[in-house]
Amino acid sequence: MFLAQEIIRKKRNGLALSAEEIQFFVKGITTNAVSEGQIAALGMAVYFNDMNMDERIALTTAMRDSGTVLNWQSLGLNGPVIDKHSTGGVGDVISLMLGPMAAACGGYVPMISGRGLGHTGGTLDKFDAIPGYQTEPSSELFRKVVKDVGVAIIGQTGDLVPADKRFYSIRDNTATVESISLITASILSKKLACSLDALAMDVKVGSGAFMPTYEASEELARSIAAVANGAGTKTTALLTDMNQVLASCAGNAVEVKEAIDFLTGAYRNPRLYAVTMGLCAEMLLLGGLATDEADARAKLNRVLDNGRAAEIFGKMVSGLGGPVDFVENYSKYLPQSQIIRPVFADTQGYAHSMDTRELGLAVVTLGGGRRKPGDALDYSVGLTQVCALGDKIDASTPIAVIHAQSEDAFAQAEEAVKKAIRIDEVAPEKTPEIYAYIRAADL
């Protein structure tokens, strides 16, 4: 039997907690035996004194086990259960293509996603733009769609990782969100509750990333790869670029459109393609669905080119309550804003740098993201045709097209976009889409 205050005291004094102490405290979070003040105190103690790798693994697995842990064995799946998670960015629409692509190659992808946070867009918000799509289905329907279609992208259900839900809300209000140990446990407890065989982790770097520096992003990526592998899930973390909008757009309905255009081959943004392929190929390799990277990429290109990935996306949408002909007729179903107009730079030259975070906040201001939890979203608004760094910009080349519901909203977004995209006489140096892979062998 332990006392919560003694566990807090031990961590406050910089000592390592045992797995049993961590399990006791997490159980108290779940049952309310531990108070908000005690949770906040432990969070702050961890923030200042950190956790070693054994503590991080113990915290992650204890939070994973605080609620339902999904079991796929009874379904008799004939392939690996694989997934990816992103720390979030702007125009990060990867999940919508990657899930169906991995499923088309023989994987099963039970993807539990989140809503928008701060300047970053949420995968669930994009699906809410599709009429009828159930982002919170019953667990029976979720399992059925995963088994029959190969992929289902839904929101976190109440019985998954309840300890994280309570801990996170307290961290958010007590300035302990930025702890690498606590971020690692929060992300992975949710993913590992899905009983994955393999996970590809997308850790963003740059002006639109959650972590402020490359070094902080790398530290988080290493922590996630080490803890996930230590907890028994084959995991690779990729460090990917978020110094500019990843897709050609940012918003909800506009990103769904770009995802379908990508899957059908109508248009594939080269940067989006590079990161999607990198993550998806890693999932196939970790899941044993490909012999090497070249084989993985060939398989993925095949399911894009033969239409199988697009077909699976359509089946997932209809399986979860959306229109049966959504892929073929998405323009009939996706909402459109009142004003769709380009914005031009005041000077000529090259798109030199981008404050990606500010572009994400411009979408929030338009109504496409939340200023506070519970805000209703306007799924039609956002940015499209966002220029890429290095693009030549002149008087006839828009730096973006704004989708707004009023002239006031357009004017506000126009000012934000102009401020966020810097034009220079000199083209910037090209940066890679993927900076590094952190695999189990690298730890």
From Swiss-Prot:
SUPFAM superfamilies: Nucleoside phosphorylase/phosphoribosyltransferase catalytic domain, Nucleoside phosphorylase/phosphoribosyltransferase N-terminal domain, Pyrimidine nucleoside phosphorylase C-terminal domain
Keyword Glycosyltransferase in record: yes
Domain of life: Bacteria
CC terms in the record's Gene Ontology section: cytosol
GO MF assignments: 1,4-alpha-oligoglucan phosphorylase activity; thymidine phosphorylase activity
UniProt pathway: Pyrimidine metabolism; dTMP biosynthesis via salvage pathway; dTMP from thymine: step 1/2
InterPro entries recorded: Glycosyl_Trfase_fam3 (IPR000312), Glycosyl_Trfase_fam3_N_dom (IPR017459), Glycosyl_Trfase_fam3_N_dom_sf (IPR036320), Nuc_phospho_transferase (IPR035902), PYNP-like_C_sf (IPR036566), PYNP_C (IPR013102), Pyrmidine_PPas_bac/euk (IPR018090), Pyrmidine_PPase_CS (IPR017872)
Catalytic activity as recorded in UniProt: thymidine + phosphate = 2-deoxy-alpha-D-ribose 1-phosphate + thymine
SMART domains per record: PYNP_C (SM00941)
Keywords: Glycosyltransferase, Transferase
EC number(s) on file: 2.4.2.4
A single BP term in Gene Ontology: pyrimidine nucleobase metabolic process
PANTHER family: THYMIDINE PHOSPHORYLASE
Protein family (similarity comment): Belongs to the thymidine/pyrimidine-nucleoside phosphorylase family.
Function: The enzymes which catalyze the reversible phosphorolysis of pyrimidine nucleosides are involved in the degradation of these compounds and in their utilization as carbon and energy sources, or in the rescue of pyrimidine bases for nucleotide synthesis.
Assembly behavior: Homodimer.
Name assigned to this protein: Thymidine phosphorylase
Organism (species): Shewanella sp. (strain MR-4)
